[in-house]
Amino acid sequence: MRQKLSFQTLQKKDDMKKILFGLTAALLTSAAAANTLIPDVSPASSGQHVVINITQQRLFLYDNGKLSKIYPVAVGKAMTQTNLGEHKIGAKAYNPVWHIPKSIQKERNDGVKSVPAGPNNPLGPVFVRLGDPKLSLGIHGTNAPASVPGVRSHGCVRMKSPDALEFAKTIATGSPASVIYQMASLNEDANQNLWLAAYRDPYDKKNLDTAALKKSIAAWAKAHGKTIPA
């Protein structure tokens, strides 16, 4: 769903909910909009930096401060949320054995404690450690590609297996990885039109700051000599 936005629209909670579930809406409508809007982050100016926005179900890879790749991902469910915050990319394991965590063993209740490498392994062809090993988090492939993107993992960040292999070969161990929760993005396109994307709230944080959005939009409009409908 796309529609022209106004400050009045941003003030109405019911209207904002419609926008959230519409996923993408346009401000100062143009025929050309970016397919994926970029979150409001300050990536590392040198080296690589991974940014995962839970609400977008997207992984953004930056090289020397510039966006180089966007991948769709599946993230943790509301009951098994992916840990927000600052992490580091850790060790990589190709053709990993899945040693099933006890919590998942209990959930499965089939007596299986591990799954060998192969087409039936939920980790896919590669597992990249995300953060402290004590968190048991990783960025990995999958044997269920239709589940990506989505909000359905036990906390790990799931990628389609070809993407996971590409990512693993590209990313350097020790690179910073930021897991964020931004419910809206504002980006300017090549035609100097401003686009707003608003996302679902899978962890029910209710932290969409419409006042900050209004302030940012007003500042942009003033800088570009444009008028926002009241």
Q: For the regions a protein language model found, what residue spans apply to each?
A:
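Short, Lys/Arg-enriched N-terminal segments with co-localized hydrophobic residues
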Residues: M1-D15
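Sec-dependent N-terminal signal peptides
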Residues: I19-L28
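N-terminal signal peptide c-region/cleavage motif recognized by signal peptidases
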Residues: T29-A33
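Gly/Pro-biased beta-strand-loop elements
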Residues: N35-S147, E166-T170, L194-A230
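Short, charged beta-turn/beta-strand-edge "cap" motif at the junction between a beta-strand
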Residues: T80, Q182-L186
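Short, basic/aromatic beta-hairpin or loop at an interaction surface
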Residues: P145-G155
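Short beta-strand-centered segments at strand-helix junctions
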Residues: S153-T170
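Loop/turn positions that initiate beta-strands
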Residues: G174-A177
